[in-house]
């Protein structure tokens, strides 16, 4: 079978960086270099060029999809003779630990909020829907954080279901990476956004991923457009270790940090510890639960060195 025939048979349209960048059209750059610097993650290189060539075309595509969705809602309201409720357009962002999901989410939030048609863009991470540490300890799951069984999926599904049902005020729990736990009584209220960006490891998972907790509705059932941020495993491991080393010199030095003891490690000890955490927890979760969901995404961003996106695949 020829490459051309294989391309025709795939459910995705494939673009290299230059082809994708050309789809920006005339969308203006609405972020300054200072704003971009504030949006990037602790271990990522996010440049003006990256935003212009990757994220502006993506924001343009999403604007088309969102506008189409609003027109469809208007048609339904006309048919029913009703004044419709504000129903948010939900974008999910999945991918491995350390791949840069949070940066992608923050950049898209900033860009989409600047489109005149829809200014209210909320960003929620699924970390808040992890079971509290006390529950995880009781169930012997502290080393399984991020795995399907560590989440309160019923609460997460209810959260997105309520938003899609037009409930005006919906609360989401908030997670603190400092204390490595859900913040008690720290819920965030989400008030009828035009767009919700939902970022997390598990947002593309379905019933096959939860045999231990069978239920019939999943987050992915409520998502309008899903993004998977991808990268080769060797890069993911390197990024994870580098991020751990930066935390060792930064966040871990806070006496209130759950991982304060790691700040006392030598660099060699820290690298060894990070490697162990990667192999025994994060790599395992990637292979078993995250990577298998990649082909369910509407769009796949594949990164190379320095977190630069080199390929984009868009579902037909």
Swiss-Prot record:
Catalysed reactions, semicolon-separated: (R)-pantothenate + ATP = (R)-4'-phosphopantothenate + ADP + H(+)
Annotated GO MF terms: ATP binding; pantetheine kinase activity; pantothenate kinase activity; protein homodimerization activity
Entry coiled-coil feature ranges: none
Source organism of the structure: Escherichia coli (strain K12)
Domain of life: Bacteria
Localization in the cell: Cytoplasm
PANTHER family, alphabetized: URIDINE KINASE
One Gene Ontology cellular component: cytoplasm
Principal location listed in the UniProt entry: cytoplasm
Inhibition and activation profile: Regulated by feedback inhibition by CoA and its thioesters.
Pfam families, A to Z: PRK (PF00485)
Biological process (GO), any one: coenzyme A biosynthetic process
UniProt-recorded name of the protein: Pantothenate kinase
UniProt: ATP binding residues: 95-102
InterPro entries assigned to the protein according to its UniProt record, in alphabetical order: P-loop_NTPase, PanK, PRK/URK
Record keywords, A-Z: ATP-binding, Coenzyme A biosynthesis, Cytoplasm, Kinase, Nucleotide-binding, Transferase
EC number, UniProt record: 2.7.1.33
Family: Belongs to the prokaryotic pantothenate kinase family.
Biological or metabolic pathway of the protein: Cofactor biosynthesis; coenzyme A biosynthesis; CoA from (R)-pantothenate: step 1/5
């Amino acid at each position: 079978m020829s490459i051309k025939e294989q391309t025709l048979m795939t459910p995705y349209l494939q673009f290299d960086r230059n082809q994708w960048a050309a789809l920006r059209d005339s969308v203006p750059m609405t972020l300054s270099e200072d704003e971009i610097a504030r949006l990037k993650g602790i271990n990522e290189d996010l440049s003006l060029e990256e935003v212009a060539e990757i994220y502006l075309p993506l924001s343009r595509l999403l604007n088309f999809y969102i506008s189409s969705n609003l027109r469809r809602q208007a048609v339904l309201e006309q048919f029913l003779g009703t004044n419709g409720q504000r129903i948010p357009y939900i974008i999910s962002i999945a991918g491995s630990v350390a791949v840069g999901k949070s940066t992608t989410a923050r950049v898209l939030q900033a860009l989409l909020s600047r489109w005149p048609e829809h200014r209210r863009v909320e960003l929620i991470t699924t970390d808040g829907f992890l079971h509290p540490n006390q529950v995880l300890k009781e169930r012997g799951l502290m080393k399984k954080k991020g795995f399907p069984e560590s989440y309160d999926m019923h609460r997460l599904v209810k959260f997105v279901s309520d938003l899609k049902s037009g409930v005006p005020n919906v609360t989401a729990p908030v997670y603190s990476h400092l204390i490595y736990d859900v913040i008690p009584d720290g819920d965030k209220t989400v008030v009828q956004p035009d767009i919700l960006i939902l970022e997390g490891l598990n947002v593309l998972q379905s019933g096959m991923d939860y045999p231990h907790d069978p239920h019939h509705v999943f987050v992915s059932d409520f998502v309008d457009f899903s993004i998977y941020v991808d990268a080769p495993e060797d890069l993911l491991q390197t990024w994870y270790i580098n991020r751990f080393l930066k935390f060792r010199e930064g966040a871990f030095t806070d006496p209130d940090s759950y991982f304060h003891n790691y700040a006392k490690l030598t660099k060699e000890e820290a690298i060894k510890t990070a490697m162990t955490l990667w192999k025994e927890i994060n790599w395992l979760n990637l292979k078993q639960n995250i990577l298998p969901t990649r082909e369910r995404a509407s769009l796949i961003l594949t990164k190379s060195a320095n977190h630069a996106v080199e390929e984009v695949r868009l579902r037909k």
